[in-house]
């Protein structure tokens, strides 16, 4: 599984510590993060253009905005640790940057879970040329 995530990073440029973020998504949604979210809508994976297609796509938009607030933390590559307490994700605090990156990923994974009922398979592999217009501001 770890090798699959490393390959995914190289191929599609998924942001963040892909291993931890992918694990969070899997735990929260019971969906394969690579196949279910990497190409979803206009804001998941590569992209960030146009209006989010639905609530799940908005989760990705907000996640990108969260990372944009942490440019000095290298959120695309900085690994972190987290654990669970009573089923809830708890971010470790080894450094402020790692904690903030983890909190961005935690919020996105929870957002995906909260919007599972409106997950739309037609956006699962959405062609990015359909994403038109300027993206709203964070």
From Swiss-Prot:
SMART domains: PA2c. It is found in: Secreted. Pfam families: Phospholip_A2_1 (PF00068). It comes from the Eukaryota. InterPro entries: PLipase_A2 (IPR001211), PLipase_A2_Asp_AS (IPR033112), PLipase_A2_dom (IPR016090), PLipase_A2_dom_sf (IPR036444), PLipase_A2_His_AS (IPR033113). Expressed by the venom gland. GO terms for cellular component: extracellular region. Its main location: secreted. Keywords: Disulfide bond, Myotoxin, Neurotoxin, Presynaptic neurotoxin, Secreted, Signal, Toxin. One of its GO terms (biological process) is lipid catabolic process. The keyword Secreted applies. GO terms for molecular function: calcium ion binding; calcium-dependent phospholipase A2 activity; phospholipid binding; toxin activity. This is Basic phospholipase A2 homolog ammodytin L. Disulfide bonds join 42-131, 44-60, 59-111, 65-138, 66-104, 73-97, 91-102.
């Amino acid at each position: 599984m770890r090798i699959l995530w490393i390959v995914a990073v190289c191929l599609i440029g998924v942001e963040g510590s892909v291993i931890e973020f992918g694990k969070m998504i899997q735990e929260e949604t019971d969906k394969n993060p690579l196949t279910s979210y990497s190409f979803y809508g206009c804001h998941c994976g590569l992209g960030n253009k146009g209006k989010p297609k639905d609530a799940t796509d908005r989760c990705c938009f907000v996640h990108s905005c969260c990372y944009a607030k942490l440019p000095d933390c290298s959120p695309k590559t900085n690994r972190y640790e987290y654990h669970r307490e009573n089923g809830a994700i708890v971010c470790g605090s080894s450094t402020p940057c790692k904690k903030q990156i983890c909190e961005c990923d935690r919020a996105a994974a929870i957002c995906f879970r909260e919007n599972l009922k409106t997950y739309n398979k037609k956006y699962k592999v959405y062609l990015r040329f359909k994403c038109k217009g300027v993206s709203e501001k964070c």
